[in-house]
């Protein structure tokens, strides 16, 4: 009979087990399809081993004590099995929870086992930094596990003993009963408690010994915590807190020994004295620390904290890889000539006139062609084209099947037909048409380009930045490839990517994805391929979750295909004496150590992922490489053309610049007083004041012979608007990652971005032009202020865009403002502005320079005509009539130039 009952439950158990294994099987299939099964298996086996070991050890120890406590409490009366079973269930649940928690620490365990030394010692304990990064987290996890085990065991054992001692029973109906009266067989409370005390003493010994270990480790954590002026252990920590923790460690261990030896020495009062002394010293040390900090340190803070401030400065520079910055003086000379401008043509011709935000809006109007396409981002890169080094904007045209009409939102369309984006758009950052629109190096569908090196053999984009649902290829349904006039072109995927949908994978993914269509669709064949995790950030973090990924991947055209490059970082929040930062640009977590050690390259067509180590000196990435052999490749394995497109990450540079603005003050006294603090300045974008953003430029650094691709950012003194310096990092392969800081003279005024913005606002002609354009129904967008070093001078360039206030706007580059020294001009093009400043040419008469005072009949008439033509132009644009739109724009131009 019992066997029949068991047989009834076997199918249900099998089904339940299959559902539990679905996630595991789906991951196994996917990792095998991308070629990273060893990574997955390493994580899986380590997690499973930790879970099993942690659970079994916890259960065996706690349940063993439960059995012992039950027998002790029951005496000769006998153990109540049901009560003991309840204790076993409690132990099993606690063991499972603890084991599950321990299994999530697989990265800490593996890093501890494979750790790489930094060969740098902390200044207080003299330990290698690797102890804090790799060993201390492991010891902390171990202590937390043991403390949870021993405390839980003490509690559950005490409950088990008390339940048996009190005569609690469970009847045949599962109801608790209490048997009152004296304990049977003549045993008193004192007798049974005496039998239970040895077990309690042993557990308390283990608890206090573990507590002693915890207090000992806490001493090390003072080196990366923040209190007061110093990041890390300061004077009070070194003289009071750390010695006090050492004393408390010894006392806690001695208390544990007293518990262990209590049966022999029979001196319970000594335990009481020990525990009392422990709390007294803990309270006194906290009070002493407060008094020392308040009465001794704060009145003489710099002298007492000077040494520790030095530790803080040096460690922070090390933590953010800023210790080897090359600082140079940059005396600003306003002696540029027209010849200098011509000699720096590569710099001038790559000044970014198009900001990525209006560029994105313009691309959406001119190059999407269909509502289901999208440009998720506009990236900045550089290419060698016909012997010229050109900075460009590039954006991938991705598929967004969520934008299909509602009636077309079918499973077949979203997962079998509209599977991929198509091509990319590339535009030089400096060129505009006569209509104020960008020129294109690559455009349209299919992509066309005058440069053979930019041709694409596989323009299809199956993997990108967007929220991309899974798709299935190699089906009986053709995939939409691209629109061609009134027709659509269809294709079939010819790559090897994806999970083969044989019977078992179809069943597994149907359950995981909640898609019955995977089982019943007649379009699928055994050769069909399922493409999962098509968002490239999700895809890369699925394989290597221990890295931190930059939120701004960028697309590259190389070797006839599209590839994505993603910056990946190793981070830690345990670098001694390094100041922590919390930023959403890299990670929501706090960190005080970061290295851009890895570049990830993802093929947009196949989804193939490669991880390349670009900073082999980073001990953290060396540790990960040992944890996962075969995952990482050396940087030299990157194809040369792709390697030429590596760039220094914008987000990391922003963090480093912010840190360097404070920590360039390496003199502890200057640092303490913040006498020379630098900040990242503000600028005006549109009509809003915002923080200045780092920007990529192609330029010739002072003293260098050729132009190169760099990322740069200016600094201003805190609470001032003038420039104090600028920071640059090289991006070209031969000198990648080299940082230089150029410092301006503190005795001479060098205009900062907000001072240039103020000069623009105060210029009557420019202000009148902006007012006029705004009155004509347009919105004036003030672009980023770019500070361009040329020779030993600075050029300031700010583009102005016009866009309609209606929906479907098409931003146009209307004017370029250039400032040099005391000169300021606004002209239709950059070249004209430079000719006005350096060539002695008379400035073109802007429309506002001819505007009469309010009430002038001629002004009112022309303004009315311009306003009317502008409204008609916007109506034509909204209806998609670009030809009519251009005619109206030309008529406006005629009125402006003739007035």
UniProtKB/Swiss-Prot annotation:
Keyword Iron-sulfur: no
GO cellular component terms, A-Z: extracellular region; plasma membrane
Entry-linked Pfam families: UPF0182 (PF03699)
Main location, first listed in the record: membrane
Annotated coiled-coil segments of the chain: none
Membrane topology: Multi-pass membrane protein
InterPro entries (alphabetical): UPF0182
Membrane-spanning intervals of the chain: 6-26, 39-59, 93-113, 136-156, 196-216, 240-260, 271-291
Keyword Membrane: yes
Family: Belongs to the UPF0182 family.
Identification of the protein by name: UPF0182 protein Mhun_1303
Provenance organism: Methanospirillum hungatei JF-1 (strain ATCC 27890 / DSM 864 / NBRC 100397 / JF-1)
């Amino acid at each position: 009979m019992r066997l029949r009952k068991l047989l009834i439950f076997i199918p249900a158990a099998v089904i339940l087990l299959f559902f539990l294994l679905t996630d595991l099987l789906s991951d196994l299939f996917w990792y095998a399809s991308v070629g990273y099964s060893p990574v997955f298996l390493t994580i899986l086996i380590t997690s499973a081993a930790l879970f099993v070991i942690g659970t079994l050890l916890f259960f065996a120890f706690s349940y063993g004590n439960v059995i012992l406590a039950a027998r002790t409490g029951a005496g000769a009366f006998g153990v109540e099995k049901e009560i003991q079973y309840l204790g076993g269930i409690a132990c099993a649940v606690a063991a499972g929870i603890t084991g599950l928690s321990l299994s999530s620490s697989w990265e800490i365990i593996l890093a501890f086992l494979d750790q790489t030394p930094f060969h740098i010692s902390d200044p207080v304990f003299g330990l290698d930094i690797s102890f804090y990064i790799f060993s201390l987290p492991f010891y902390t996890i171990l202590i937390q596990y043991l403390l949870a085990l021993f405390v839980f065991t003490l509690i559950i054992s005490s409950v088990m003993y008390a339940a048996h001692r009190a005569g609690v029973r469970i009847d045949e109906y599962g109801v608790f009963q209490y048997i009152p009266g004296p304990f049977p067989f003549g045993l008193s409370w004192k007798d049974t408690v005496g039998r239970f005390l040895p077990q309690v003493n042993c557990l308390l010994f283990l608890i206090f010994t573990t507590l002693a270990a915890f207090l000992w480790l806490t001493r090390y954590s003072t080196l990366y915590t923040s209190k007061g002026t110093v990041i890390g252990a300061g004077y009070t920590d070194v003289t009071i807190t750390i010695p006090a923790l050492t004393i408390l460690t010894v006392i806690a261990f001695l208390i544990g020994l007293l518990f262990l030896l209590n049966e022999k020495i029979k001196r319970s009062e000594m335990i009481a004295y020990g525990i009392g002394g422990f709390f007294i010293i803990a309270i006194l040390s906290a009070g002493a620390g407060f008094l020392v900090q308040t009465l001794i340190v704060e009145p003489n803070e710099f002298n007492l904290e000077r040494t520790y401030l030095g530790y803080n400065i040096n460690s922070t520079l090390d933590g953010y890889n800023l210790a080897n910055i090359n600082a140079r003086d940059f005396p600003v000379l306003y002696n540029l000539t027209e010849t200098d401008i011509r000699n720096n043509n590569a710099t001038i011709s790559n000044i970014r006139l198009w900001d990525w935000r209006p560029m994105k809006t313009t691309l959406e109007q001119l190059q999407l062609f269909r509502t289901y396409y999208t440009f998720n981002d506009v990236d900045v890169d550089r290419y060698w084209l016909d012997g010229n080094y050109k900075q460009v904007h590039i954006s991938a045209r991705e598929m967004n099947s969520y934008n299909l009409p509602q009636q077309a939102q079918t499973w077949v369309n979203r997962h079998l037909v509209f599977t991929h984006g198509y091509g990319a758009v590339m535009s030089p950052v400096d060129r505009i048409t006569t209509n104020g629109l960008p020129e294109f190096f690559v455009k349209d569908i299919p992509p066309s380009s005058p440069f053979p090196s930019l041709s694409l053999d596989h323009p299809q984009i199956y993997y990108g930045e967007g929220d991309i649902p899974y798709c299935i290829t190699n089906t009986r349904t053709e995939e939409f490839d691209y629109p061609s006039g009134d027709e659509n072109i269809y294709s079939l995927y010819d790559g090897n990517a994806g999970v083969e949908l044989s019977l078992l994978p179809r069943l597994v993914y149907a359950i995981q994805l909640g898609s019955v269509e995977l089982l019943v669709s007649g379009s699928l064949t055994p050769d069909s391929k399922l493409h999962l995790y098509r968002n490239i950030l999700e895809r890369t973090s699925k394989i290597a979750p221990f890295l931190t990924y930059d939120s701004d991947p960028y697309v590259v055209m190389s070797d006839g295909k599209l590839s994505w490059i993603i910056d990946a970082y190793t981070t830690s929040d345990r670098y001694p004496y390094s100041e922590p930062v919390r930023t959403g640009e890299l990670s929501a977590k706090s960190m005080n150590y970061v290295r851009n050690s890895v570049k990830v390259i993802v093929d947009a067509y196949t989804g193939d992922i490669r991880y390349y180590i670009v900073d082999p000196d980073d001990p953290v990435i060396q540790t990960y490489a040992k944890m996962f052999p075969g995952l990482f490749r050396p940087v030299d394995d990157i194809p040369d053309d792709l390697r030429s497109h590596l760039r220094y990450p914008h987000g990391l540079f922003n963090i480093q610049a912010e840190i360097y603005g404070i920590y360039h003050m390496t003199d502890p006294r200057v640092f303490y007083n913040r006498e020379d603090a630098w900040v990242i300045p503000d600028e005006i974008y549109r009509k809003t004041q915002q923080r200045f953003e780092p920007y990529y430029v192609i330029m010739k650094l002072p003293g260098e012979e050729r132009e190169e691709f760099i990322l740069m950012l200016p600094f201003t003194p805190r609470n001032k608007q003038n420039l104090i310096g600028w920071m640059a990092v090289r991006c070209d392969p031969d000198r990648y990652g080299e940082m230089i800081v150029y410092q301006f003279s503190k005795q001479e005024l060098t205009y900062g971005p907000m001072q240039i913005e103020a000069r623009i606002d105060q210029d009557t002609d420019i202000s009148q032009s902006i007012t006029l354009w705004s009155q004509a129904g347009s919105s004036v967008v003030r672009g980023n202020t770019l500070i361009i070093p040329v020779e030993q001078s600075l050029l300031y360039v700010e583009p102005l865009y016009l866009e309609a206030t209606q929906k479907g706007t098409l931003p146009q580059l209307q004017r370029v403002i250039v400032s040099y020294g005391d000169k300021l001009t606004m002209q239709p093009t950059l070249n004209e502005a430079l000719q006005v400043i350096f060539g002695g040419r008379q400035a073109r008469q802007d429309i506002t320079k001819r505007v009469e005072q309010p009430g002038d009949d001629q002004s009112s008439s022309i303004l009315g005509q311009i306003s009317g033509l502008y409204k008609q132009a916007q109506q034509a644009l909204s209806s998609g009539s670009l030809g009519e739109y251009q005619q109206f724009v030309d008529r406006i131009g005629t009125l402006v130039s003739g007035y």
